[in-house]
A protein has these predicted regions:
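Short, well-ordered alpha-helices that flank and scaffold nucleotide-derived cofactor binding pockets
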Residues: 23, 50, 145-149
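Conserved donor nucleotide-binding strand/loop of the catalytic core
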Residues: 1-12
Length: 151
């Protein structure tokens, strides 16, 4: 289905394109996989569908667990930790990084929230290697190296 020109710019939001799609296609569950995330697997997709189909979640998206590392702003200020009380890594709960590569949602949730996720949200945890999102030349080189190593 062609998108209207206003949804085809460098600044168009994916959520707006998904809402446009939902107005023209009948579906219960939408799977949105970004082309820039080539390592998302059918297992990840199926897990997300099952999470939403079971009605335990209204939507779900792919994440990777990341252990705590000290983060700094460009102004050289610690982000979310106290420089005078640096925690030990093993004492800090891990965080989950949104992959940007896979989203599963119901039509109702999408149309109500106007967002790809909302309501009761679930995480589809994927290994770091499948969480690569190609947004730079370095990301592309990394993806090519991974493909070369498994070919």
């Amino acid at each position: 289905m062609p998108r209207p020109s206003e949804l085809c710019t460098d600044h168009s939001k994916s959520d707006d394109a998904l809402i446009h799609f939902s107005k023209h296609v009948d579906f219960d569950i939408l799977v949105f996989q970004q082309a820039t995330s080539p390592f998302i697997s059918p297992l990840d997709i199926n897990k997300g569908i099952k999470m939403v189909e079971s009605e335990c979640f209204d939507s779900a998206f792919a994440v990777t667990k990341e252990d705590w590392l000290p983060r700094w702003s460009m102004a050289v200020n610690p982000i979310n930790w106290d420089i005078n009380n640096r925690p030990m890594r093993q004492d800090v709960d891990p965080v989950f990084i949104e992959s940007g590569g896979l989203y599963v949602t119901t039509k109702t949730q999408l149309e109500n929230s106007k967002l790809r996720y909302g309501g009761k949200i679930g995480f589809i945890e994927v290994p770091t290697i499948r969480n690569i999102d190609i947004n730079s030349f370095e990301d592309l080189e990394l993806a090519e190296a991974i493909i070369s190593s498994i070919s």
